[in-house]
Amino acid sequence: MAPPGSSTVFLLALTIIASTWALTPTHYLTKHDVERLKASLDRPFTNLESAFYSIVGLSSLGAQVPDAKKACTYIRSNLDPSNVDSLFYAAQASQALSGCEISISNETKDLLLAAVSEDSSVTQIYHAVAALSGFGLPLASQEALSALTARLSKEETVLATVQALQTASHLSQQADLRSIVEEIEDLVARLDELGGVYLQFEEGLETTALFVAATYKLMDHVGTEPSIKEDQVIQLMNAIFSKKNFESLSEAFSVASAAAVLSHNRYHVPVVVVPEGSASDTHEQAILRLQVTNVLSQPLTQATVKLEHAKSVASRATVLQKTSFTPVGDVFELNFMNVKFSSGYYDFLVEVEGDNRYIANTVELRVKISTEVGITNVDLSTVDKDQSIAPKTTRVTYPAKAKGTFIADSHQNFALFFQLVDVNTGAELTPHQTFVRLHNQKTGQEVVFVAEPDNKNVYKFELDTSERKIEFDSASGTYTLYLIIGDATLKNPILWNVADVVIKFPEEEAPSTVLSQNLFTPKQEIQHLFREPEKRPPTVVSNTFTALILSPLLLLFALWIRIGANVSNFTFAPSTIIFHLGHAAMLGLMYVYWTQLNMFQTLKYLAILGSVTFLAGNRMLAQQAVKRTAH
């Protein structure tokens, strides 16, 4: 147990107040990442280009290839003096190796000078200028600048502009490089922002990293601060270092180059503040340890780290302010044992000073102060409902279990009282989770209640069987009472078997089955009862109604026989025959509709029959009219 006045510190997270402070780095190169990046660069040479990426990339990280002499021999043996690209790779790689000198003939020099022309591509101009610079050969910087500017107006890609920045860093400071420097602002405007955290070109990570490396190298060369905001630098940094595994040697080289300039330049050095250890590390002293590094995880030992203030997250009250961290080796420590923090969460605002180049040097740390909870004044009582008998109270001390059993029935209630205190400070605690669990020893049924504190922070749980019978499903029996205490700031969450309580419900309210029955047994099969069809009428009734319906037709035939049918005007003209056949067909269609067809099918056929019958009938009536007129 910690001595009084001390607490356990857990560092939970590194956050930022976005509305007040600048962005904080979310991605950087840890020591493990740096070693992995070095391993990505330390590959066997396959050609002069791969040798350049490997040698110069490792050099930017402060490392060397394993065998510098062998590497120099490889460069000399693979150099093609008639190829500008080959000369560029050889010049830059040999410059990164100590004692590796390469002699250049006049013909090769003339080749490089001839390549510095507006007829060459920006890439060729960059490689020629960098090769001349690497070999220590003279160059007319203003003429090279004119050729570069003229060619850049024809190549407006992001990569071409970045290579123009790289070229300018090899030219004389006496040349007017303003036109190239102004391209930086244009490139920044072409960056894409992702979620307010990342900033990169759509061309990808490699181009973004080369842009950062070229910008700071050129700005260090001309002595002017780059036109990039501090927040944008952090966003670029987050984008570049978000990737830890590299598919190509050139990609690893670009990240190494960007990391090198962000760690060492004259204007912007991002600060990375990292808690030492993980959230599971505990210390029986109130000490906060921070690692303050650059993007390569190299300690900024010359920095000064100060705590501006520490505020409680719950009350926003300031509990500590204006305190300096003490450098201990490569870390900075803040000992606040003399300050009595109550358990909970606190926001520590930390500032890193000591160099005006530092950016992202104000961060807010979320710190959790943990403690141990103690249970005091635990009383178990049975209270008579009509208060005719004085309450019976038994005091229990954690972690012991109360002796005997307690009864709760229709005549008396059961009550539990207790208080929670901070073991270290003695202050009262109100954890987030305070539960009373009752477990039926026979059926396994469990019922959980929340214990609430009163205005004096005394927790009370009272069991009235008449009010709680629904929760228990009126299941009488012996229940084990557990007290559960939990909170994110507690080192010792508690599950305490407090006592056995006999709960009795009236027998008439007892259920036929208890809740503990197996809820997953197969249920009784449901028998579906469909509606029975209506009974049909007797055959005699059906036949009677059929005869009644046909009676008018029988009457028609009877009258025709008695009076006589007038068929004198009937002709056997085609229109007459078609009309009567069509009429008969429509009557037949009605029968088929009744027995087989639906309405839409019937309408389709009726339209055809009706049209033919209509035309035939019209023709027939016209002929009858002509015949009458003639007579």
Curated annotation (Swiss-Prot):
InterPro entries referenced in this protein's UniProt entry, alphabetically:
Ribophorin_II_2nd, Ribophorin_II_3rd, Ribophorin_II_C, Ribophorin_II_N, Swp1
Q: Which domain of life is it from?
A: Eukaryota
Q: Subunit comment for this entry?
A: Component of the oligosaccharyltransferase (OST) complex. OST exists in two different complex forms which contain common core subunits RPN1, RPN2, OST48, OST4, DAD1 and TMEM258, either STT3A or STT3B as catalytic subunits, and form-specific accessory subunits. STT3A complex assembly occurs through the formation of 3 subcomplexes. Subcomplex 1 contains RPN1 and TMEM258, subcomplex 2 contains the STT3A-specific subunits STT3A, DC2/OSTC, and KCP2 as well as the core subunit OST4, and subcomplex 3 contains RPN2, DAD1, and OST48.
Q: Which residues form the signal peptide?
A: 1-22
Coiled-coil region list? none
Major subcellular site: endoplasmic reticulum
Origin species, per record, is: Homo sapiens (Human)
Listed name of the protein: Dolichyl-diphosphooligosaccharide--protein glycosyltransferase subunit 2
Q: Per UniProt, what is the membrane topology? A: Multi-pass membrane protein
Key words of the record: Endoplasmic reticulum, Glycoprotein, Isopeptide bond, Membrane, Signal, Transmembrane, Transmembrane helix, Ubl conjugation
Q: Where do transmembrane segments lie in this chain?
A: 541-561, 572-592, 597-617
Instruction: Name the job this protein performs.
Output: Subunit of the oligosaccharyl transferase (OST) complex that catalyzes the initial transfer of a defined glycan (Glc(3)Man(9)GlcNAc(2) in eukaryotes) from the lipid carrier dolichol-pyrophosphate to an asparagine residue within an Asn-X-Ser/Thr consensus motif in nascent polypeptide chains, the first step in protein N-glycosylation. N-glycosylation occurs cotranslationally and the complex associates with the Sec61 complex at the channel-forming translocon complex that mediates protein translocation across the endoplasmic reticulum (ER). All subunits are required for a maximal enzyme activity.
- Ranges per topology, Lumenal: 23-540, 593-596
